From Swiss-Prot:
Residues 1-19, 98-146, 218-370 are cytoplasmic. InterPro entries: Connexin (IPR000500), Connexin_CCC (IPR019570), Connexin_CS (IPR017990), Connexin_N (IPR013092), Connexin_N_sf (IPR038359). One gap junction consists of a cluster of closely packed pairs of transmembrane channels, the connexons, through which materials of low MW diffuse from one cell to a neighboring cell. Residues 41-76, 168-196 are extracellular. This is Gap junction delta-4 protein. A connexon is composed of a hexamer of connexins. Residues 224-370 are annotated as: Disordered. Residues 331-346 have a biased composition (Low complexity). It is found in: Cell membrane; Cell junction, Gap junction. Expressed in pancreas, kidney, skeletal muscle, liver, placenta, and heart.
């Protein structure tokens, strides 16, 4: 017990287990009820029977009428009511002090953990707060039980007070009980003062009952807030951790797949090729496309060669041209907006113009071959 003695620890324990409404009720009961009964009620009711006068000389009639008027002395009834209402609170306080002293003697280490009670060990009250390094035990269950008993006792004594005395003290009380002959009128001393005192104690009893209900509601709400959640076993924690890792791994894999399957931007797909570039390379065929100027030069050179050779040879060369066949067989993977140039096999060389100077030359070479 660091810095707090046994008496201080017991006071702190009792203070932490009693609500503010309960403390107000205790002050109300001790000051407005017990002190008023002892200091104001005793002088008013000490000579009550002596001053209870009846208009008859019949022996025993006054005693019988007084017994009917007041079966129980008002002063004694109020004292019994106050003691009975205070009894549950006194029992609860003694229980808290006893348990607090026992826990302080055992020490904080010898008390087992309430969340994991071991077999064969005495279970200690669950701690809910710390004051000066000490764990204050929780006695909220006992406090709620004592509130229920106190409220029931308050209601029972209030009903009994109404059936015995009513709300006001009458000035004249008629009596017809034997041995009285006929109707006998009896007179009460200080009826106004007694009526005021009875009304005051009625108000104190009603206020005590309402405070008991409010204290019960506050105690139930505080206990619900302090109630801990169900303890999680190590196996459940491991399963939850494994499932969390699996979900994280699955999320990472899905993110990687999305990154791999994401389409490239149009600028990266073009690879630096402009729309007006003279040379564009096809990704599938691997051949270099020839611009329009180069195609015209090739066409003119091919026509000149065909003009120098016999007419039957160009057809064989055109049929054996590997470039034309390769371009027709291999599919092109370029975009549709890029138009493929005409192949060389589709070029038909024009017929050479017949000239007068070329005919004698051909006849001379033919004569040499023969």
């Amino acid at each position: 017990m660091e810095g707090v003695d046994l008496l201080g620890f017991l006071i702190i324990t009792l203070n932490c287990n009693v609500t503010m409404v309960g403390k107000l009720w205790f002050v109300l009961t001790m000051l407005l009820r017990m002190l008023v009964i002892v200091l104001a009620g005793r002088p008013v009711y000490q000579d009550e029977q002596e001053r209870f006068v009846c208009n008859t000389l019949q022996p025993g009639c006054a005693n019988v009428c007084y017994d009917v008027f007041s079966p129980v002395s008002h002063l004694r009834f109020w004292l019994i009511q106050g003691v009975c209402v205070l009894l549950p609170s006194a029992v609860f306080s003694v229980y808290v002090l006893h348990r607090g002293a026992t826990l302080a003697a055992l020490g904080p280490r010898r008390c087992p953990d309430p969340r994991e009670p071991a077999s064969g060990q005495r279970r200690c009250p669950r701690p809910f707060g710390e004051r000066g390094g000490l764990q204050v035990p929780d006695f909220s269950a006992g406090y709620i039980i004592h509130l229920l008993l106190r409220t029931l006792l308050e209601a029972a004594f209030g009903a009994l007070h109404y059936f015995l005395f009513g709300f006001l003290a009458p000035k004249k009380f008629p009596c017809t009980r034997p041995p009285c002959t006929g109707v006998v009128d009896c007179y009460v001393s200080r009826p106004t003062e007694k009526s005021l005192l009875m009304l005051f104690l009625w108000a104190v009893s009603a206020l005590s009952f309402l405070l008991g209900l409010a204290d019960l509601v506050c105690s139930l709400r505080r206990r619900m807030r302090r109630r801990p959640g169900p303890p999680t076993s190590p196996s459940i924690r491991k399963q939850s951790g494994a499932s969390g890792h699996a979900e994280g791994r699955r999320t990472d894999e899905e993110g990687g797949r999305e990154e791999e399957g994401a389409p490239a931007p149009p600028g990266a797909r073009a690879g630096g090729e402009g729309a007006g570039s003279p040379r564009r390379t096809s990704r599938v065929s691997g051949h270099t496309k020839i611009p329009d100027e180069d195609e015209s030069e090739v066409t003119s050179s091919a026509s000149e060669k065909l003009g120098r050779q016999p007419r039957g040879r160009p057809h064989r060369e055109a049929a054996q041209d590997p470039r034309g066949s390769g371009s027709e067989e291999q599919p092109s993977a370029a975009p549709s907006r890029l138009a493929a140039p005409p192949s060389c096999s589709s070029l038909q060389p024009p017929d050479p113009p017949a000239s007068s100077s070329g005919a004698p030359h051909l006849r001379a070479r033919k004569s040499e071959w023969v």
